[in-house]
């Protein structure tokens, strides 16, 4: 019964529809194939078999039903293509299903119209006079802007920091200030990506940039656009610790919004110590060069100003000093004149010998005394008789023969004095390296030697070495004292324990006696 009633209703509805279509007048002329005019529905024309309805402030064509002109509608226009039932839009062909042809920026374009079956705008439909735009990652309805001759992006004019992109069929100026992802159909867009409808499917696309995005300039990804006066300029972006590159020994910190590379405190202290060590070493080397030049100049003075005879005499006397033979000392004493030899023996008192020993003991090191050319000159002047006699072995024998009468009576004194002088010379003699430069530093050299000059100032390296040696010696002394104290404490503990043990042993004996 129900199926029968339903079939009757369908038959009645079909008969009414056919009658209504036959009674519709599409203007002048016959059917669609002969160029009949359709009903203007908003900004487009509905084909035959469709109904023009108003939804959410927009005129849309519904397939089937009655074709009625809405209030305020206008009839007119000619469809092209005959039975295609679609209008050519801008010379590019007919629009797709769900699109309508409209003018944007003075040109006809196919755009999607929002209806209850079409794309929504952020979960809602836009009213008449509004367009759907993407702002800060959120779809929303905004008023359709008035057409402007200055527009550079459809009906809009994009600023230097905006992107021109098509959203829902409209060219729009957009920029992304957010960083949170947002939903786009079945996808998730990440700024600066934008959500657009492509082929009836919402997709995430990257925004195209205009040629000049900073006034009349173009800023790349490493620069940012700032306003300066009446114009715009591209300046480098402020780096963060994520983009700034530091060396291996440095770390990145943010200071007043800028990323800076610094050295950690521990590494900085170590680097300061290394730099101080290098500075001290360089200063020591710089100070050591003038001292070496001064010493070399002082050593070179006697050789430059000295006479050839004196230089030869010094070389002759250097050889016996290296060999240090006692015979040469005896020969020197024998070659001395009889009067001088006797006077030397008479005045060689113990007090003078002691004074000579004290003078030699308080003498400066060889490194300081080597830089005294005066001693060499005095030594050479007083050693002239020995130099002349040493160069003539024949005169040496003659001198011995002629000196026999004078030395015959003084033989005991000479023999007694010889061992003492020879031993004193050997005891107070300096190392061979130093005595080689001073062959005749015997009684004559010691008597006529001038007072020692003040020692040269120590360099920083020598001072540091002396301080290091002093600290090592002090540390060794303290360690030795601690060791001695430990030994004493151990001995005292041992004695105390022995006394306590002896007392404990003595107590039972006294108790037994009692």
Swiss-Prot record:
One of its GO terms (biological process) is sporulation resulting in formation of a cellular spore. Residues 1-18 form the signal peptide. Residues 40-62, 240-262 form the Follistatin-like domain. One of its GO terms (molecular function) is cellulose binding. Residues 285-297, 480-508 have a biased composition (Polar residues). Residues 328-391, 398-413, 424-457 have a biased composition (Low complexity). The keyword Repeat applies. Disulfide bonds: none annotated. Residues 285-514 are annotated as: Disordered. One of its GO terms (cellular component) is spore wall. Keywords: Developmental protein, Differentiation, Repeat, Signal, Sporulation. The keyword ATP-binding does not apply. This is Prespore vesicle protein. It comes from Dictyostelium discoideum (Social amoeba).
């Amino acid at each position: 019964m129900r199926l029968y009633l339903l079939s009757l209703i369908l038959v009645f509805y079909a008969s009414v529809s056919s009658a209504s279509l036959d009674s519709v007048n599409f203007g002048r002329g016959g059917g669609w194939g002969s160029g009949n005019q359709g009903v203007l529905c908003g900004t487009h024309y509905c084909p035959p078999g469709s109904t023009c309805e108003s939804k959410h402030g927009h005129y849309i064509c519904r397939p089937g039903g009655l074709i009625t002109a809405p209030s305020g509608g206008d009839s007119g226009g000619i469809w092209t293509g005959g039975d295609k039932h679609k209008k050519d839009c801008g010379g590019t062909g007919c629009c797709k299903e769900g699109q309508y042809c409209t003018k944007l920026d003075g040109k006809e374009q196919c755009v999607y119209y929002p209806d209850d079956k079409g794309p929504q705008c952020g979960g809602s439909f836009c009213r008449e006079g509004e367009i759907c735009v993407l702002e800060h990652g959120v779809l929303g309805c905004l008023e359709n802007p008035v057409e402007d001759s200055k527009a550079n992006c459809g009906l809009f004019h994009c600023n230097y920091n905006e992107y021109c992109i098509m959203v829902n069929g409209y060219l729009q100026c957009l920029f992304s200030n957010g960083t949170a992802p947002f939903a786009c159909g079945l996808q998730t867009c990440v700024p600066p990506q934008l959500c657009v409808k492509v082929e009836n499917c919402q997709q995430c696309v990257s925004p195209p940039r205009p040629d000049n995005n900073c006034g009349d300039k173009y800023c790349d990804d490493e620069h940012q656009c700032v306003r300066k006066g009446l114009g715009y300029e591209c300046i480098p972006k402020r780096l963060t610790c994520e983009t700034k590159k530091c060396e291996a020994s440095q770390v990145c910190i943010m200071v007043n919004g800028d990323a800076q590379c610094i050295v950690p405190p521990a590494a900085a202290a170590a680097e300061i110590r290394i730099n101080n060590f290098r500075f001290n070493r360089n200063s020591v080397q710089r100070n050591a060069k003038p001292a070496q030049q001064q010493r070399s100049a002082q050593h070179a003075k006697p050789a430059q100003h000295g006479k050839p005879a004196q230089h030869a005499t010094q070389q002759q006397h250097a050889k016996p000093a290296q060999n240090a033979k006692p015979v040469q000392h005896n020969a020197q004493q024998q070659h001395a004149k009889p009067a001088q030899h006797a006077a030397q023996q008479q005045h060689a008192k113990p007090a003078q010998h002691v004074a000579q020993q004290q003078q030699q003991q308080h003498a400066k090191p060889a490194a300081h005394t080597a830089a005294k050319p005066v001693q060499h000159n005095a030594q050479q002047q007083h050693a002239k008789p020995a130099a002349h006699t040493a160069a003539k072995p024949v005169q040496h024998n003659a001198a011995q023969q002629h000196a026999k009468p004078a030395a015959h009576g003084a033989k005991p004194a000479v023999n007694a004095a010889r061992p003492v002088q020879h031993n004193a010379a050997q005891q107070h003699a300096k190392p061979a390296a130093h005595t080689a430069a001073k062959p005749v530093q015997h009684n004559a050299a010691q008597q006529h030697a001038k007072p020692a000059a003040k020692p040269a100032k120590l360099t920083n390296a020598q001072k540091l070495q002396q301080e290091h040696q002093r600290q090592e010696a002090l540390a060794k002394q303290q360690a030795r004292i601690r060791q001695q104290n430990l030994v004493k404490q151990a001995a005292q503990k041992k004695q105390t324990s022995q006394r306590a043990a002896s007392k404990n042993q003595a107590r039972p004996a006294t108790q037994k006696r009692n």
